[in-house]
Amino acid sequence: MRSDLDIAQAARLRPIRAVAADLGLTDDDIELYGRSIAKIDLGILQRLTDQPRGRYIVVTAITPTPLGEGKTTTTIGLGQALARLGKRSVVTIRQPSMGPTFGIKGGAAGGGYSQVLPMEQFNLHLTGDIHAIGAAHNLLAAMIDNHLHHGNQCGIDPYAIFWSRVVDISDRVLRNVVVGLGKKEDGPMRQTQFDITVASEVMAILALTTNLHDLRQRLGRIVAAYTRDGAPVTAEDLHAAGAMTVLLKEAIKPNLLQTLEGSPALVHCGPFANIAHGASSVLADMIGLHCADYVVTESGFGADIGFEKFCDIKCRASGLAPDAVVLVATVRALKAHSGRYTITAGRPLDPRLAEENPEDVADGAANLAAQVRIARLFGRPVVVAINRFPDDFPSEVEVIRQVARESGAFDVVESFVFAEGGAGGCDLARAAIQACEAPGTFTPLYPLDMSLREKIETLATKVYGATRVEYTPEASRRLAQFEHQGYGNLPICMAKTHLSISHDPKLRGAPSGYVFPIRDVRLAAGAGFIYPLAGDIRTMPGLPAHPAAERIDIDAEGRTRGLS
C-alpha cells in the first residue's frame, strides 16, 4: 500500500469554497488561506442560532500502545462514511504540534484513505494558530519578568512564578533553564523552563472558549504567579490579557479543510490529553452542529483519560452532550495488554504479534472491558469499532466482539477505513446512526459542588480502578489553598500517563486494588480546571535517536518528502 503522503499528494482537492457550501457557508462566512484552507468567521453562530443541531458523535479508544490505534483515522473515516450514506457530516479534530510530527509519532492527519487534506499544511503551521498561541503565552512570560525588573509593584515572589515560556518543538535541553544572565539591566536572574506550546494553558483556553469576550475573560483569569503573601497574581493584574487576546483574534476562528473524499473537516486547537483536556475546540463543534447532520469528533487517548475529560470538562464548557460514543480497539493493542509483548515507538514490532493467538487477545481484553465500562458511565451508547489490520485473524476479532458485547457495548463493528476510506466504514456509520437514536441521558461523572478531594477520589475509584488516593503534603496544601481561594468548584483534569488506566505506564490491562498517588496539584484558572499530577508527566518532550525530521525533505518542484 502507498504511503500516507503519497496518497495525500495524489488526491484531487475540491475548492474550499465548494466544501464550505456543503455546510451552508457563504463567501461572507469564510476567509481564504490559499485554495484549500479557510477560516470560519464566528458571526456564523449568530446567523445559525435558530438552526436545529445535528447529532454529536465522539470517538475514543482502549488504552493505546505508543504507536496509536487509529482513533483519528477512524474519526475521519466515519465522517467520510456518513457522507457516503447521504448524511451531511463534518469531522472536528485537533491541530497537531510540530514536536511529535518531527519526533517519533509523525503527523496526525489520519492515515491511508482516511486523511485530512492538505496533509502537509495540516501537520506543519496550518494557518499559524499555534504560533499565535505561543506568542500570547510568551508575551505574558515577558511581562512577568519585566514587572520584576521595574520594581515588582505586585510583590511577586520570584520563587512562586509558575508561568514558563513555550516553543512548538520537542527540545529536552529547555526543560530547565536560567534566564537573566548578564548585567543588571538584562533582568533578574531566575531558574525557569520551556514547555511545548500545546501544553500551554492558553491552548486549553482557546479550545474551551465560546466567543471572543469569553476568551478575553479567561485570559485575564490566568494565575501566573503568587505574591510573597500567597495571593494569586493574574494576567489581568499584569495588564497582559488585552494584548494576549489581540494576538489570538484570528486564531479563535476554526480552520476549514477537507477529508480525502472531499467532505468538510474543521481543525482547531490541539491541547494534550495527558496534561490538558485533549480535545479540539468547542467553537468548531458548535459551528459543525449548526451546519451538519452529524459531527464526528475525537477525544485524546483512551476513554479513561480523554473521553472522561471530554465529558467532565469540554461538555461543561460548551453545554453540549454527545449522542453516541465510538470506542476504537485493535487486536495488536489487546495482545500488548496481555503483558507478553512490549511495543516501543521507533523499534520493530515483535514478530509474534502477527501470529494467530486469540488467547493473548483474551488475556488483554480486560482493558477493552474496562474502557467500555468507563465510557458507559456517562449514559450514552458505546459502539466498539474494531480497527482491522491486515494480519488480524478472525478468531482474534471474535474475541473482541464477544468481550465488547459482554461489557455492554451497543454494537460491535469491524472498520476498514484505513485501507478503504469511507466505503470501509459504512457499517460503522450505520451503527453510530442507530446509537444516536438510542435512549439514555448524558450525565457527568461528578457534580461540581463536590470538594476537590471528593472529585479526585471519584475519578481514582470509579475510572482508574484504585482503592484509595494518597496525597503528598504539598498536594494536600495546594488543595486546601485552592479551596480557600474559591477554586473548589472547578472540574478535575488529571495529568497522568496515557499508556495505562492507572498512573503507572507499566500497569497494563485493567489495574485494580492499588493506591493512586497525587504528588502535586496545579491550577489552570483561565481554562477552568484543577490539574493534579499523578506520576512523572513531562511538558517538554525530547527527540528520539532518529527523529522523523531526519527523513523529511523537499524536492526541486516543492513537493514534501518523508512526512508521515
UniProtKB/Swiss-Prot annotation:
Pathway in which this enzyme or protein is active: One-carbon metabolism; tetrahydrofolate interconversion
Assigned EC number: 6.3.4.3
Catalytic activity entry: (6S)-5,6,7,8-tetrahydrofolate + formate + ATP = (6R)-10-formyltetrahydrofolate + ADP + phosphate
Name of the gene encoding the protein in the UniProt record: fhs
Enzyme's top EC category: ligase
Gene Ontology BP, a term: tetrahydrofolate interconversion
Organism of this sequence: Roseiflexus castenholzii (strain DSM 13941 / HLO8)
NCBIfam families for the chain: PRK13505.1
Membrane-spanning ranges: none
Family: Belongs to the formate--tetrahydrofolate ligase family.
Gene Ontology terms, MF aspect: ATP binding; formate-tetrahydrofolate ligase activity
Keywords in alphabetical order: ATP-binding, Ligase, Nucleotide-binding, One-carbon metabolism
Classification via InterPro entries: Formate_THF_ligase (IPR000559), Formate_THF_ligase_CS (IPR020628), P-loop_NTPase (IPR027417)
Residues annotated as binding ATP: 65-72
Domain of life according to the entry: Bacteria
Protein name: Formate--tetrahydrofolate ligase
